[in-house]
UniProtKB/Swiss-Prot annotation:
Gene3D superfamilies: 3.90.550.50. Its cofactor is Mn(2+). Belongs to the glycosyltransferase 31 family. Pfam families: DUF4094, Galactosyl_T. Beta-1,3-galactosyltransferase that transfers galactose from UDP-galactose to substrates with a terminal glycosyl residue. One of its GO terms (molecular function) is hexosyltransferase activity. This is Probable beta-1,3-galactosyltransferase 4. InterPro entries: DUF4094, Glyco_trans_31. It is a single-pass type II membrane protein. Keywords: Glycosyltransferase, Golgi apparatus, Manganese, Membrane, Signal-anchor, Transferase, Transmembrane, Transmembrane helix. The gene is B3GALT4. Pathway: Protein modification; protein glycosylation. The lineage of its organism: Eukaryota, Viridiplantae, Streptophyta, Embryophyta, Tracheophyta.
Length: 407
């Protein structure tokens, strides 16, 4: 009995030990699986929620940005259609846009010219004031009368005929937008007797534009370039005119003629010619650089005769900006014409700017008043100091023409 009970006790003890080991292993495996399951549910789920929220926010931002881009594109399309519509609505719209672009270009040129003036010094003499530069009023034209130290009598003849004196000239600037000045530089000895004589004349009449330029017959090309650069910096005008002091001019007729070309951005107006290139030394108008114009006997390109010509604002701006690289030929009218070669410039050949002193009278009687009159044989009015009044009497437009003119 005791042996059987003892044997059963051992079996039960062994069985309990076996069962407890099984359960222990099972429970360990179970807890391990439960731990994995618990971890999967507790941690990845919030992370996926964060990613999901970020994705949603990102998608929302992309959607809004896309809508903004679409609206911008639609706005641009509408704006483009509006602009094109405006262009097609008016036949003058393209010309107006071209003039606006030209105005912006000249404003840029103004800024460049001002900067160069500050960096390199003013192009005019130190004793000359520039009140117009501050106001920048708009003018129709600036008429520069080219003169020399020895031409006092010529200047007086011009003052007595077609250039209004003193207060009348100032009134002309204010009411008609026409500026008129005698243009002269300084002598090779600044402050000498010649300069003092001009200064005294300026104090009396106040009608000079003094240039930072040394006077000399062979320096006319440089003087012309300096004149346009200086006038462009001082006065905001539609046109800049150069005329010699031995030429008769009808100012009202000139203004009316130039006003016809106001919508032309780049226009060069004068009596166009093409004379022979003179290679022989010692003759008048000898061309030292004749070889640049081809074989002997060739002619110059078309250019305005030097007695009187006019250029538009854009061309004056071009000269001002490029003054340091523009080549100077010995003849100033040839130089000016060469500066416009290669540019999109309209050349206007107007024969009313170069009437003869014998023709201008009957033309005036017929109602076809000349803009300018002179004698071709003298490249100006022969003995102009003595004959200017007579030419003015016969060929002038009348004393009231300028007052009644509207441009």
């Amino acid at each position: 009995m005791s042996l059987k009970h003892h044997h059963r006790g051992l079996e039960l003890s062994a069985s309990k030990s076996f069962v407890s080991k099984k359960w222990t292993l099972f429970l360990c495996i179970g807890f391990f699986c439960a731990g994995i399951l618990f971890s999967d549910r507790m941690w990845p789920e919030p992370e996926s929620n964060v990613v999901s929220r970020d994705t949603v926010a990102s998608d929302e931002r992309l959607r809004l940005e896309s809508e903004d881009c679409d609206s911008s594109k639609k706005g641009l399309k509408r704006e483009s259609k509006d602009i094109l519509g405006d262009v097609y609505k008016s036949p003058d719209a393209i010309q107006t846009l071209d003039k606006t672009i030209s105005k912006l270009e000249t404003e840029l040129a103004d800024a460049r010219a001002a900067q160069e003036s500050i960096m390199n010094g003013s192009p005019v003499s130190d004793d000359f004031k520039l009140p117009e530069t501050v106001t920048k009023r708009k003018y129709l034209m600036v008429v520069g009368v080219n003169t020399a130290f020895s031409s006092r009598k010529r200047r007086d003849s011009v003052r007595a005929t077609w250039m209004p004196p003193g207060e009348e000239r100032k009134k002309l600037e204010e009411e008609k937008g026409i500026v008129m000045r005698f243009v002269i530089g300084h002598s090779s000895t600044p402050g000498g007797i010649l300069d003092r004589a001009i200064q005294a004349e300026e104090s009396k009449h106040g009608d000079f534009l003094r240039l930072d330029h040394v006077e000399g017959y062979l320096e006319l090309s440089a003087k012309t370039k300096t004149y346009f650069t200086t006038a462009f910096a001082m006065w905001d005008a539609d046109f800049y005119v150069k005329v010699d002091d031995d030429v008769h001019v009808n100012i009202a007729t000139l203004g009316a003629e130039l006003a016809r070309y106001r919508m032309k951005p780049r226009v060069y107006i004068g009596c166009m010619k093409s004379g022979p290139v003179l290679a022989q030394k010692g003759v008048r108008y000898h061309e030292p650089e004749y070889w640049k114009f081809g074989e002997e006997g060739n002619k110059y390109f078309r250019h305005a005769t030097g007695q009187l010509y006019a250029i538009s604002r854009e061309l004056a701006s071009y000269i001002s900006i490029n003054q340091n690289v523009l080549h100077k030929y010995v003849n100033e009218d040839v130089s000016l014409g060469s500066w416009f070669l290669g540019l999109d410039v309209e050349h206007v050949d107007d024969r009313r700017l170069c009437c003869g002193t014998t023709d201008c009278e009957w033309k005036a009687q017929a109602g076809n008043i000349c803009v300018a009159s002179f004698d071709w044989s003298c490249s100006g009015i022969c003995r102009s100091a003595d004959r200017m009044k007579d030419v003015h009497r016969r060929c002038g437009e009348g004393e009231k023409a300028l007052l009644a003119a509207s441009f």
